Amino acid sequence: MRKLLWLIAVTAIASIASCSRLTHGDAMSHNSAIPDTLRVGTLYSPTSFFLFRGDTMGYEYDRICSFAQSKGVATEFIIASNLQSLIAMLDSGVIDVIAYEVPITSEYRKQVLNCGSENITYQVLVQPKSDTLITDVIQLINKDVYVEHKSKYEARLRNLDEEIGGGIRIHSLDEDTITSEDLIERVAKGKIPLTIVNSDIALINQTYYRNINIDLQVSFPQRASWAVRKDNQALADSISAWSELAESGTADKQMLRRYFEMSKSGALPTGLSDAKSIISAKHGIISDFDIYFRRHGQDNGIDWRLLAAIGWVESQFRSDVVSWAGARGIMQIMPRTARAHGLELENIEDPNLNIQVAANIIKTLDHILRKRVSDPDERRKFVLAAYNAGMGHILDAIALAEKYHKNPNVWNNNVQEALLMKANPQFYNDSVCRNGYFRGRQTVEYVSNVSHYYSLYCSKIKK
């Protein structure tokens, strides 16, 4: 269940992605198979390793951190541009382990020693949920299926078409920036009827789009796992033994649920109306927390109605909300961010303190972006995007906009489009990017939603 790519200097990645402290001592830990600092190679992807709101995340990332912590060793992460680069790093001794899915095939077995939990994936059909689901590949005859041009999905679909005697209407999309996630979104929104993607990508996207079905497998299974050098049987055995125990534990089940089951939709719940976002326009009351929005807005030079709009979109003014990523409270503050602002986890859901930290963050983001985007109304969109995604991804999007002839000072149809490009390895591996893969669609939607409610509040509530 995972996948993707990029190359950054070792020291840069080590500084942002270490998930455990360096323990002093000999070159090797008390377990002679494991060095005191485990050098981990991986690729940016929605399943293995990515940055979100300043935190490092990913199913493979969490699991390798758990392994290292169980052994009492530190970690250093090195991000490669592709799987062959990772294997070359492993072979040359730059890294100790690949925490990314390496296919278990005769070809790869000549180069690496697979270890740890095996993950089995398939190519699956993505279709809208309905009462008339396609449940057999034969039913694809006379159906329109859309796939990426010259992709493994197109190759499999053409083979399948031959196997069943023809009749599948195959649409090979040759678009520069298209990804599997784009095609899944098009199915979810009714723009295309069917597509084919890997099951791990399908599982993650099902947490964003609950109206799709991914049950029909259309390929043979592919086995994959982590890998070490062929001469490092001791480390392989240690990882495999840990994996066997971890799979039955609560922590591993929680990781699976976090990345592959919990809803990640950035959209507001259905049934919410503009009227429900305001207690009383007549009396100038947006929420029960207006006193805090006003106080911390004034202290930080921020329109309190903007803070309220963020609070509504983030949590619908509920202080007990916890997101899949661990963000908490009315303003959905990440625990790591809270600690950086002196707010301990036990107090993170306190409305006053939660809103105070959010206001401080927004003030800081505005200060950083002021040098790049002079127009305050335009800059507000950038600030909202950075609040939702993390500043690093927005700076990447600005850099991509500059490189690919878009206006880096304008959000709509310019930097927002560049942010969407960061879901594609062609662009997040670009030399101007420093923060890797990012799924930008939810951030684009977030900016639009907050802007809508801010405009609504400004039209109905006095400052």
List each model region and its residues:
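Substrate-binding/active-site groove segments that recognize
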Residues: 149, 320-346, 353-364, 450
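A ligand-binding cleft/hinge motif common to bilobed small-molecule-binding domains
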Residues: 84, 99-110, 158-159, 185-220, ...
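Export/targeting segments at the very N-terminus of extracytoplasmic proteins
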Residues: 263-317, 352-355, 369-373, 462-463
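Extended ligand-binding regions for polar small-molecule ligands
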Residues: 58-70, 129-153, 201, 220-266, ...
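Catalytic and substrate-binding regions of cell-wall glycan-acting enzymes that process beta-1,4-linked
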Residues: 378-456
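Extracytoplasmic small-molecule ligand-binding "clamshell" domains
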Residues: 19-102, 106-110, 171-178, 239
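Periplasmic-binding protein-like
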Residues: 42-46, 117-131, 200-243, 262-264, ...
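Bilobed "Venus flytrap"/periplasmic-binding protein-like clamshell domains
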Residues: 39-69, 103, 124-178, 283, ...
